[in-house]
């Protein structure tokens, strides 16, 4: 549902943020 979709998006954003931080 929406919650799982939001979690997936947050995970993607977190990964991109980690790459940017490195």
Swiss-Prot record:
Coarse class of the protein's main subcellular location: secreted
Subcellular location per the Swiss-Prot or TrEMBL entry: Secreted
Tissue specificity comment: Expressed by the skin glands.
Residue numbers bearing the Leucine amide modification: 22
Superkingdom to which the source organism belongs: Eukaryota
CC annotations in GO: extracellular region
Keywords, ordered alphabetically: Amidation, Amphibian defense peptide, Antimicrobial, Secreted
GO terms (BP aspect): defense response
Function per UniProt: Antimicrobial peptide.
Family per record: Belongs to the gastrin/cholecystokinin family. Magainin subfamily.
Name assigned to this protein: Peptide PGLa-BM1
